[in-house]
Structures are given as structure tokens and as C-alpha cells.
Amino acid sequence: TLNAQDEAPKLSVSGTVDVYYRANLSAPNDEDAIAPGSSFAQLPGFSLGMANVIASYEGEKAGFVADLVFGPRGTDAIFASPMYSGSGNIVNQLYAYWNVSESVTLTMGNFNTFLGYEVISPAANFNYSTSYLFSYGPFSHTGIKADFDLGSDWSLMTAVMNPTDLTEFNPTGDYAVGLQLGYAGQYLNYLNSQGAYEVDFTGGFDLSESFFLGVNAAYFDASDDNDASFAGAALYPQIATSESFSLGLRAEYFVETEGGAGAIGAYDVDGDADIFAVTLTGSYTVGNLMIKPELRLDSASEEATFI
């Protein structure tokens, strides 16, 4: 029998669908159409994003999440799969968790990255297109992590995982380590995978009831014997003008050295380049529908392909 205070386990299914139209203002829109070097929302004309279906089971002590994606955005997000399973390229997240105590949770399986301000699901981002910092950071991990509530708004996460974005199994025998220290919604993140490492700060501040400022900054170094690296920072000011409409800007500066991650695509004689991208997005909400008109301008230091 259940006590009156006990809650029955809950199984829920949720999800989103996104579609879009994209056109270049000063570049071809035919078979020679180009797009920014960031991830997702790169296809011309009327295009598909993805369908996202999430099944979750929440018990008092344990639960699971099965997060499936279908469509071009989902395919791009799980670019390293299928590695073994024929259906591996639809699994965005697949993990189980155990609430060891009120302050400790263990999670094992495939989960989206803890680094960065933006996420794979467009419904959870203010801007529809994505930043360079998000695009060239990790997307997902498979491993085990421990989350600790340290009290007084402090939190700590530690993780041991397969190499970055190898989500179905580990073909290399190498392992990555991750750390996150959080305080009152501000997070300092660290990831080391196969000699490469990334340090990331993600946070935000409510400057008033209607004005929010998000912040993301990161530095990535490829490996001990490779000088390639990138760094960048982005600001996300957002203002709510009414209950149904908000306006947001993403201003990002991104720089690569020794070829970096290949994001910009054109470099000087030393292999260096930088890009400044400004994205203005409106967000209009009608019930469960979000409509996001967006204008994006990317300007690179070299003669790279950009819009």
C-alpha cells in the first residue's frame, strides 16, 4: 500500500517540432547557396529542423530519460552515430539516474553536454540559429556523472565519460573527465578528452523583471602536440516587451589560431582568423507555438564564406 504522502511514479511523453525558412540577403540562394559555419539551420528555403520526442519516468529514487530526434537537425546533432546500432542516429539522450540522497544524484548513460549556453533543442534556445561557441564545443557524452547540491546555491558535478561525442560505446579505450562548479545559476565548466581540453563559463543575470543578460565564454586547446585552439565570448541580452513577445540579441566574437576547429574556413599565413556575428531574434508565443523572425550578420577577418 502507498502512504498518502507517497507520490506514484510518473511516466510522461513530451516533445517539439521545428521547421524554418532561410534566405541569404547578399549571397546565392540556389544550388550555390552558402550558410554560416555554425551548426544547424543551414539549409536554404523552406526546410525541416527536427522532431524531438522525450519519454521520461520519474520515481522517488530513480528514473530515466529517452530522448529521440528525427530530421536534419537531429542527424547533425548525433553526427558520430550510428557506430553500432542501426538506430543510433535517433538517440539524442538515453540515461538513467539514481537520487542517492537529497543532495547527491548519479546519472549513467548518454546525456547532452554540460558546457555552453545553448543546447541542441531549438525550443530551449532564444535564438534559432546557433553560435560558433556552441557549434564547436561538445554536443553529447556517454558515461557516469555525479551531481552534488552543496547548499547555499553551490553545486558540483564530476563525470567520467567516453571521448567526446562517441555516444554508443567506447572504441578507443580513452576516457574524458568533466567538472562543473555552479553558484546561483553561474557555471564554470571543464572538459578534458584525449589530450584536448575546454574551459567554459556559462551564466546569466536578471537585470530587471523584463531584462535578462546571458553570458558565455570559452577557450579550447586541441592537444599537447597541436597548437590549434579557439576562444570566444557571447552576450545574450533579452527583453520581454509583453507577455507574448520578447526581443533578443546574440553578439559573439570567435577567434581561431593554427586553424582552430575549421569553423571560419579561411585563415592568414599563421592559420589565424576571427569572426564577429550578430543575431537579432524576435520571439512571439501563441499557446504552445513559438514564431521567431531572425536576422543574422556574420563578418570574418579573412575572405571566408559568410552571410
Feature names for model-found ranges:
Residues 11-19, 64-66, 106, 156-158, ...:
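Transmembrane beta-strands of outer-membrane beta-barrel proteins
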Residues 52-73, 149-151, 202, 206-216:
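Surface-exposed extracellular loop regions of Gram-negative outer-membrane beta-barrel proteins
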